[in-house]
Structure formats: structure tokens, C-alpha cells
Regions:
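N-terminal secretory signal peptides that target proteins for export/translocation
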Residues: 1-20
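Sec-dependent N-terminal signal peptides
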Residues: 20-33
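C-terminal segment of classical bacterial N-terminal signal peptides
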Residues: 32-42
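Outer membrane beta-barrel
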Residues: 46-229, 235-255, 259, 342-358, ...
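Detector for outer-membrane/organellar transmembrane beta-barrel domains
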Residues: 52-53, 238, 248-377, 385-387, ...
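Extracytoplasmic loops and strand-loop junctions of Gram-negative outer membrane beta-barrel proteins
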Residues: 74-77, 121-124, 184-190, 286-290, ...
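Short glycine-rich, acidic/polar surface loops and turns
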Residues: 388-392
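Predominantly the C-terminal beta-signal and adjacent terminal strand-loop region
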Residues: 398-444, 449
Length: 450
């Protein structure tokens, strides 16, 4: 992975003999920025248009993630394996510079691409058959002054755990999100009744970096809208804001020298040498969960670690681990129709990978294993486990990768409230009914960025 190939934009280096590609990309981008500059800009590389002022430019990138899943007992009948091809993500990245210290990001996402035929067990619906709506995912004004003082304003990722800041494209495994979702993930929308989407929210992030004793410390503090509630419906009747922060300590290589802002990756395929990063993060919003009758503060504490070692034979060992603790709504809120209910409890996930040094064909193989444990404070029957083993075929880092893996868990409800966990009260009203059905799944997937 080259240094300039980030999740926000991929600057394409095109030789003179590929002039046709320069013209194609430049033409598409110029349609987006026509009238924004008073003079016709020069094209120096495919995907980037620059004016005579090197601080003024605009770049275009894109990424897709598509997969095939065969899931046990997930068919419409509930008794057969379900077999589904899906487009999980389809994004267009637009980045630009206006001044030496002022930049912007505008990214889109196919929000309903993973909706198959209008929904689970549902018929095809409207909106391009229910699976193709494109929309805004990032809109960020960036004021980047020094290593220590920077501000991002607009719609951006909430600075919490590494798993969130990796986004879907910069995990070392294809499906990085197996622990319970945060507030801005689970809501799926903005405005009244929503708390953000895709890990994003509208707000301001202050971040920077210092280098004590040859190490590297990243800090990020932020304030966001968080959950909004309508009058008489939902917990946040006082329109309180959400606060989030992350503190990351890199003891070896300075990984943030290669990442945009406070964003992260799940590893670097050995491109930046040895990496050891320890981090803590958290969120808080008063009356951020629960219901009108039973509001509660939303609180999280998260710790994560990344260790990557380049071995003597040029193979690369990568290790990720993450611990999350959620304090959310009371048990009484689950029976309220207006409850913004979330997972309440602890989770832990860890995975290890080894990238072989030998190139076979056009890429290198990377086997891995993963374990996830989730335990709700209200769930009947205790915690639940999930095991995953897989193989990546890495062609060009995060920009071109094939994956195949097998997953086994003790419940099939997915990660939104924790794998296998539900939000349904038991008959006595003393706990939540578990989804204890065993579930296996096989997935083959492709990820591309350019």
C-alpha cells in the first residue's frame, strides 16, 4: 500500500503511455468542479486536477466491496442454507484543497446496496428495487494547521475505537464489524430519532499529535449532535450533545504519518515497519439512550491494540484486539415503543494474521483466525462466542484483495445488538430472550479501490 493511497482518496499515478486514462478521469472530475476555478487547471496525474497554485486541487477515487454468502438456516423457510451475492459497499471519494491549510472531503455510499430485494423475506420494492440508493456519507471541512492543532468540521467518523476508524475498507479482515455497534452505527439516520449513520455524525473534531521520547501520541476530542428525539417521543428531550475522544500511543512506527487525520487501519502489510499502538476511547451523551419514560445516559469505554511485526523472512505478523464496555438503557425501557435501545454489556474481539513473503501469481496469501465474545448484562443464558477462520489473497494492500472465510457463532442475530443478542423481553420481563440457534456461514469476497 502506497503512502498516498488512503480511504478518502486514491491518487492514481499514470504514465504518459496511459494518457487515455488521464483524459477519462479528468473529464469526469471536471464535470463536478466546472465553474469552481477561474482558469482551466492542468492535469498532472490521473484522478487529480491541479491549478497553477499547488495548494488548489481536486481528486477522485472510488471503491467497491462485493461478496457471496452461504448461511446456514437463513433461507426464507428458515430450514435451508441461504445463498446470496451482494454489493456491500460502493463509494465515490472526492477530495480537494482550497488553501495550504484548508481542504475538504465529499464521499458517497450506496446505502441500500446490501438490501436484497427490499429486505429480509420481503418482495422487491421501489427505490431501484430497494438496493441501489446513493447518498452522502462524508462532508468534511478540514482546517489542518500543524501537527498539534487541527479541526475537521461537518459529517465525519466519531473518534472511538480502531475498528470504527478503519471503516470497512481498511480492516485486515473483510467483515471487521462483529462486536456491538455504537450509537452512530445502529441508528441508521440523522435528524429526529436518529444518531448518525455508518459511524458518522455531524460535529467538530479537534485532533493532533505529539512525539514524547521518540514515541507518538495521537489525541482526538470531539462534540457531535448524537441522538435527537422528537417532542414527547424518545429519551433526549433536552437536546444534549454527544462527546467522544480517543488517545492513541504508538511506541514504534508513527502510523499516523501515513493516515488521513485521526483515521486508522487494521495493519499495514509491513509497509511501515514494526507497529505497536495502544489506545483508549469513549463516548458520552446524557439521555442518549432509552425512551421518553425511561431515559438513560449513553456511555462507552473502549481499549484497543495493534501490533505488526515484519519478520526476518519479510513475512508480516499482524495482531488486533479490542475490548468494549457499554452502559445504556435500563431493562424497563425495552418495553417502550419509543425506545432507542442498544446493547448493554461487554464485548471482546481479537484476530491474528500472517502474510507470507512469497508472491504467488499476482498476490500473497494471508491466513488468519478470529475470536469474538459478547456478553449482555440483561441476556438470559450468559455470553456467546463466535469463531472465524479465513484466507486473504492480497494483490495490492487494501486496494485489491480477495477473501474467503468460514464463521461459526452461537446465535444468528448479527452484530447490531451483539451477535446472537436480541432486544425482546422474556415472558417474566426479567431479561432478554437469547437467539441461541447455532449458525455457520461461508463467505467469499472482493475488495477494490482506485
Amino acid at each position: 500500500m502506497k503512502v498516498d493511497q488512503t480511504r478518502e482518496a486514491v491518487t492514481m499515478k499514470v504514465a504518459e503511455k496511459r494518457r487515455w486514462k488521464i483524459l477519462l478521469v479528468a473529464g469526469a472530475t471536471m464535470a463536478l468542479v466546472a465553474g469552481m476555478v477561474s482558469t482551466v487547471p492542468s492535469v498532472y496525474a490521473g484522478g487529480t486536477i491541479m491549478s497553477d497554485d499547488e495548494d488548489k486541487y481536486i481528486s477522485l477515487g472510488m471503491g467497491i466491496r462485493t461478496s457471496f454468502t452461504s448461511g446456514e438456516d437463513r433461507s426464507a423457510s428458515g430450514a435451508q442454507w441461504d445463498n446470496t451475492f451482494a454489493v456491500d459497499n460502493a463509494r465515490v471519494y472526492i477530495n480537494g484543497g482550497i488553501h495550504k491549510y484548508v481542504k475538504f472531503t465529499f464521499n458517497t455510499e450506496c446505502f441500500n446496496c446490501s438490501v436484497n430485494g427490499g429486505g429480509i423475506n420481503g418482495p422487491p420494492g421501489g427505490q431501484f428495487n430497494g438496493n441501489s440508493n446513493m447518498g452522502l456519507i462524508d462532508a468534511i471541512g478540514k482546517f489542518e494547521f500543524t501537527r498539534t492543532i487541527n479541526f475537521w468540521v461537518g459529517r465525519t467518523l466519531v473518534p472511538t475505537e480502531r475498528g470504527e476508524l478503519n471503516g470497512p475498507f481498511y480492516h485486515q479482515v473483510y467483515d471487521g464489524f462483529r462486536t456491538p455497534f455504537n450509537q452512530s452505527d445502529i441508528s441508521g439516520g440523522f435528524g429526529r430519532g436518529g444518531a448518525g449513520a455508518f459511524g458518522r455524525d455531524n460535529g467538530v473534531v479537534f485532533f493532533g499529535k505529539v512525539d514524547p521520547g521518540g514515541t507518538h501520541v495521537l489525541y482526538a476530542l470531539s462534540v457531535f449532535t448524537g441522538l435527537q428525539s422528537a417532542a414527547g417521543f424518545g429519551p433526549n428531550q433536552r437536546s444534549t450533545l454527544k462527546y467522544a475522544g480517543r488517545l492513541q500511543w504508538n511506541l514504534l512506527a508513527d502510523e499516523q504519518a501515513n493516515n488521513p487525520g485521526y483515521y486508522t487501519a487494521g495493519g499495514y502489510y509491513g509497509d511501515y515497519g514494526d507497529v505497536l499502538a495502544l489506545a483508549v476511547s469513549g463516548e458520552y451523551q446524557n439521555q442518549g439512550v432509552g425512551s421518553f419514560a425511561n431515559p438513560s445516559p449513553y456511555k462507552t469505554f473502549i481499549a484497543d491494540i495493534l501490533y505488526e511485526k515484519v519478520l526476518a523472512d519479510k513475512g508480516v505478523f499482524t495482531f488486533n484486539a479490542e475490548y468494549k464496555r457499554y452502559w445504556t438503557q435500563s431493562l424497563a425501557a425495552y418495553s417502550d415503543a419509543d425506545c432507542f435501545c442498544m446493547f448493554n454489556g461487554t464485548s471482546f474481539t481479537t484476530y491474528a494474521l500472517y502474510l507470507f513473503p512469497q508472491e504467488i501469481g499476482i498476490g500473497r496469501f494471508q491466513p488468519y483466525g478470529r475470536y469474538t465474545y459478547i456478553n449482555s448484562v440483561y441476556q438470559d443464558g450468559g455470553g456467546q462466542d463466535e469463531y472465524e477462520g479465513g484466507l486473504n489473497y492480497v494483490i495490492s494492500g487494501f486496494n485489491a484483495r480477495l477473501s474467503a472465510y468460514w464463521r461459526q457463532d452461537s446465535g444468528n442475530a448479527g452484530p447490531r445488538n451483539g451477535a446472537g443478542f436480541t432486544s425482546s423481553l422474556n415472558a417474566a420481563g426479567t431479561g432478554l430472550t437469547p437467539s441461541s440457534k447455532h449458525s455457520d456461514a461461508f463467505v467469499a469476497a472482493l475488495q477494490l479501490q482506485y
